[in-house]
Curated annotation (Swiss-Prot):
Subunit structure: Component of the 19S proteasome regulatory particle complex. The 2 S.pombe rpn13 homologs, rpn1301 and rpn1302 are present at a 0.2-1 ratio.
Gene3D superfamilies, A to Z: Proteasomal ubiquitin receptor Rpn13/ADRM1
GO biological process: proteasome-mediated ubiquitin-dependent protein catabolic process
Location within or outside the cell: Cytoplasm; Nucleus
Domain free text: The Pru (pleckstrin-like receptor for ubiquitin) domain mediates interactions with rpn2 and ubiquitin.
Keywords: Cytoplasm, Nucleus
Ranges annotated as biased composition (Acidic residues): 368-377
Pfam families in UniProt: Rpn13_ADRM1_Pru
PROSITE patterns: PRU
A single GO molecular function term of this UniProt record: proteasome binding
Name the UniProt record assigns to this protein: Proteasomal ubiquitin receptor ADRM1 homolog rpn1302
Length: 388
């Protein structure tokens, strides 16, 4: 019993330490000289607090014990902003604080183990922004009740007080988590080139994406510089010329039983072969489970897979596929060579990375079998474990 009540007191104390609502999260900042957003590797925390003047503050600080400095401090007026999930990022759980009245948008990657906690915290943040005074009173009342020893400290129960415990209450947002991100060793999200990316928003030439720079004004107020362009509903962030050409290639792929000589499937080829937006186009006659749940070693020894790969390469060699070969910088002779399949898969990988369809983070961690796994392998393994 003591451990149960001790846990409740610890959770309540943690909430008090970091304000009304808090969530472990890191920041995303622009890589100098590029239009690539990269994850700040530091452990951090987002939290919100109502000041004595009843102004709502959105904070971010490093979560180190020795760190007390607040790096991000934004004053938010009622309904002035929203905290939304960025579904275009498929290698991590990324949220953005987007201001409705300006071009400000600040990106954060979540460091909690539970994606459900992300959703609940985001809902509370949006409740605070919409109605800071009443929501603050409700949260404080709930925390006071928890501190007296009642075991009702979960955020989901707190959400029920606002009638927002279900997904229906969040229908304006898509909270689907494609690849859960755990705390360090973490899978850090990375956004490719902004001009072609499916995972980043275009910025104007005047925009500065180096991260938020807040300076204190004479009256103690914080003034933030606009750091990124607002979301534009007219822009198709998922556009990919390569996917368009693969769509045109699909009818040319016949369900034949020819066979190519097996070869070892490397990491880059495996990411192309198993990507959910790619494999239905290049392997239309292959059972989806064959690709979705197969590791590199399994595919390298699967004769049925290489039959489907042979059908793909015969389609790539057809005259109608000249445009696809051109953007992959491959000649017909290269495609028809003994190593043509490997060359084509590697060329596809490079194209899809440049267009933002495949997102890489260059973060590695050791798998259960001792083999070093890159982010893509971890993402696929976690997906498979969920399915099982």
């Amino acid at each position: 019993m003591e451990s149960v009540f001790g846990r409740v007191r610890n959770e309540t104390s943690e909430r008090g330490k970091y304000g009304l609502v808090s969530v472990k999260a890191g920041k995303l900042q622009r890589k100098p000289g590029t239009n690539i957003l990269q994850a700040d590797h530091r452990k951090g925390v987002i939290y919100m607090q109502m000041a004595s003047d009843e102004l709502l503050h959105f904070y971010w600080k490093e979560r180190a014990r020795v760190s007390r400095e607040v790096e991000d401090d934004y004053i938010i007026f009622p309904e002035e902003a929203e905290f939304i999930k960025i579904d275009e990022c498929t290698t991590g759980r990324v949220y953005a604080l987007k201001f409705k009245s300006s071009s400000q948008i600040h990106f954060y990657w979540m460091q909690e183990y539970s994606d459900e906690k992300d959703k609940e915290t985001a809902s509370l943040i949006n409740q605070l922004i919409a109605d800071p005074v009443n929501t603050t009173r409700t949260i404080n009342s709930h925390n006071n009740s928890s501190s007296r020893g009642t075991d009702d400290s979960s955020t989901s129960q707190l959400l029920q007080l606002f009638g927002a415990a279900s997904q229906d209450a969040l229908q304006d947002f898509n909270w689907e988590v494609l690849s859960p991100t755990a705390e360090a060793p973490a899978i850090l999200p990375r956004f490719p080139n902004v001009n072609e990316s499916a995972n980043m928003y275009r910025a104007s030439s005047e925009s500065n994406l180096n991260g938020p720079h807040a300076t204190a004004g004479e009256n103690g107020e914080d003034h933030e510089e606009a750091t990124a362009s607002p979301l534009d509903e007219n822009i198709d962030y998922t556009h990919s010329r390569t996917l368009e050409l693969l769509e045109q290639l699909q009818p040319l792929i016949l369900n034949e039983t020819t066979f190519v000589e097996p070869f070892s499937i490397d990491r880059e080829s495996h990411r192309v072969i198993t990507h959910p937006r790619v494999y239905p186009k290049i392997f239309p006659h292959s059972p989806s489970d064959l690709l979705r749940i197969s590791g590199r070693a399994e595919l390298s020894e699967n004769r049925d897979f290489f039959k489907h790969l042979s059908s793909l390469m015969e389609a790539v060699a057809k005259p109608e596929s000249e445009s696809l070969r051109e953007i992959c910088n491959l000649s017909l002779e290269q495609v028809q060579s003994a190593s043509g399949a490997e060359l084509f898969l590697h060329a596809l990988y490079d194209r899809l990375v440049n267009e933002g369809v495949i997102v890489i983070s260059h973060i590695t961690q050791e798998g259960s079998d001792g083999e070093v796994e890159e982010e893509g392998d971890v993402e696929m393994r976690e997906s498979n474990e969920k399915d099982e």
